[in-house]
Amino acid sequence: MFKHLNALFIGLALFACTSGAVAQTIKPIETPVPVRPAGQKDVVGLTTPKLDVVRVGFIGLGMRGPGAVERFTHIPGTQIVALCDLIPERVAGAQKILTKANLPEAASYSGSEDAWKKLCERKDIDLVYIATDWKHHAQMAIYAMEHGKHVAIEVPSAMTLDEIWALINTSEKTRKHCMQLENCVYDFFELTTLNMAQQGVFGEVLHTEGAYIHNLEDFWPYYWNNWRMDYNQNHRGDVYATHGMGPACQLLDIHRGDKMNYLVSMDTKAVNGPAYIKKTTGKEVKDFQNGDQTSTLIRTEKGKTILIQHNVMTPRPYSRMYQVVGADGYASKYPIEEYCMRPTQIASNDVPNHEKLNAHGSVPADVKKALMDKYKHPIHKELEETAKKVGGHGGMDYIMDYRLVYCLRNGLPLDMDVYDLAEWCCMADLTKLSIENSSAPVAIPDFTRGAWNKVKGYRHAFAK
């Protein structure tokens, strides 16, 4: 009898422990949210006076800067006023781009680590376009806004929460646009799929996925002074999340009716980073910080989820892992572009072979083409042909720059604001915090400080 009683007591104790564990609520780790200074307002939907001509100064002419200069020579209503890089030869190379386009040379700034400040201080520049290494992005943008300039900053625009809040406060205080140059939101498949989602083709969007999966083994030597490998060596977490986050967040109307509440993240151990350093320098690295693979799961206020991955170390085909999971349909870009949806989501006369649509298989190629044609985004209808001629990651870079100029010239809200920048860049600090606390949930701040529901749904602005 006592045996049975002991077994019963043990069972009840285990049940009580298990029940207690299930009932426990783990409070996410929180980071400080600075109080908005008195008299300062949010910049959700910010508009500024129209600019007949957008006068531009470029800082950083290494890997991405020259391509931006080239693209701007094809954008109407722009004037390239100044060029800056630490290395004089790079400025000279960018001047040749202007000469080839039959444009006058721009003012040159180089040879000093503070030369960029003089560019920002000029009175004849409206927009400062920053394409330097990551660690200089935020400080340059803040200085430029403080001197009355709009700023466009390469990805990632900020690497820490302190930098993010400084950019937000400066944009709010100066009422200047602060846009991150996230090109992947203009990809042809992504933008068409966004249009489909906005028109209800997938039903309610419940889950999105994105990533930056790109083996950089052949590219590490091209980064000036090895800055990118050094950054991965010294920083843990998803340090380059914006290519995946941008399209994912636009699909879910983040800070335009929904907001991200918390994340959990984990990584693998570091293998290929230290191996690469050993191979190229002979040095042993025992404390390489960034794991080869980082995976992050996010939950929003409205119960949606986002999965983000980062991997620049292992052999894998390039992928941004773009996926859309809706209540009534699905889209995926990698490894192949495909759609899946209930037949009821599409009118029978809109696509061929409508009878072949089902909820468990990819639509046939002719149906996919019909969908891509029917839901081609208005931006692509206007710019696709020119974008593919000018180029820049297949044309999406040109569309990004064109839209930036278009909105400034028409006094419209930009396609991406400083809060988008914050939400996509905060992954670096917040994923590290989660990983270093055994993948604990970490709260994602409301960077709008209360304005996340002010606009209902993400949309691009167009002049009337």
UniProtKB/Swiss-Prot annotation:
It is found in: Cell membrane. Keywords: Cell membrane, Glycosidase, Hydrolase, Lipoprotein, Membrane, NAD, Palmitate, Signal. Coiled coil: none annotated. Its EC number is 3.2.1.-. GO terms for cellular component: plasma membrane. Residues 1-16 form the signal peptide. NAD(+) binds at residues 63-64, 85, 134-137, 154-155, 183, 240. The keyword Cell membrane applies. A lipid is attached at residue 17 (N-palmitoyl cysteine). Its cofactor is NAD(+). It comes from the Bacteria. It is a lipid-anchor. A lipid is attached at residue 17 (S-diacylglycerol cysteine). One of its GO terms (molecular function) is nucleotide binding. Substrate binds at residues 212, 228, 240-243, 318. Pfam families: GFO_IDH_MocA, Glyco_hydro_109_C. Gene3D superfamilies: Dihydrodipicolinate Reductase, domain 2, NAD(P)-binding Rossmann-like Domain. InterPro entries: Gfo/Idh/MocA-like_OxRdtase_N (IPR000683), Gfo/Idh/MocA_oxidrdct_glycsds (IPR050463), Glyco_hydro_109_C (IPR049303), NAD(P)-bd_dom_sf (IPR036291). The keyword Transcription regulation does not apply. Glycosidase. Belongs to the Gfo/Idh/MocA family. Glycosyl hydrolase 109 subfamily. This is Glycosyl hydrolase family 109 protein 1. The lineage of its organism: Bacteria, Pseudomonadati, Bacteroidota, Bacteroidia, Bacteroidales.
